[in-house]
Amino acid sequence: MTRSTTLITPLTTTQRKIGAHNVWGLSNSEIAEAEHLTLETVRSYIGTMRLRLHCPPRASRAVLAHTLLRLKQVPPPELTVRHSFVPDADGRRLIHALAEHSQRGDIARATGIPTGALRTRTDVLVRQAGAANVPHLIGLAHTDGILGAEEPTTATPPPNGPAEAGR
């Protein structure tokens, strides 16, 4: 689980920008290119964000995206021209599990989906949402109120917004 009652260390502006890119579904190499950084620098920033936000050291990109959004460190992705995404109960359960767990076994237990079927079910959900990948799915789930609906996000977008936004 990603919930923690411990206070977080605030992120720097650069960490917020990299976090926003993660929420938009960009890979480390895409982030490095967009921000004119080395791949190792991006990896380092992501590791530091996990520490500052009290995520497990090997937390998935989806768990990091959810934590960034839940703690209001980055704004959710803006709605792009796409159909409205309303997952069924199983889809909602899978989204919540992907947002909270990094290990396939934990996700399978939380959803009741066999481990062997997780990849297929996740890929279908990503396509239905019009997302680029699972971290982007988590971002869109926050935008659509599927996750984090308890209060609106007040974080300000990073300067210039994420590159390739809404692709």
Regions from the language model: what does each represent?
Residues 2-13, 74-91:
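Regulatory hinge/linker segments at domain boundaries
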Residues 10, 24-27:
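Sensory/regulatory domains in signal-transduction proteins
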Residues 12, 16-17, 32-36:
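N-terminal intrinsically disordered, low-complexity, charge/repeat-rich segments that act as generic
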Residues 15-18, 22, 91-98:
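Short alpha-helical "packing" element that flanks the helix-turn-helix/winged-helix DNA-binding module
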Residues 23-24, 69, 96-100, 142:
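Short, locally clustered residues in the helix-turn-helix/winged-helix DNA-binding domain
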Residues 28-57, 103-135:
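Recognition helix of helix-turn-helix DNA-binding domains
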Residues 54-82, 127-167:
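Basic, Lys/Arg-enriched C-terminal extension of HTH/homeodomain DNA-binding domains
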Residues 96, 105, 138-139:
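Surface-exposed interaction/gating patches
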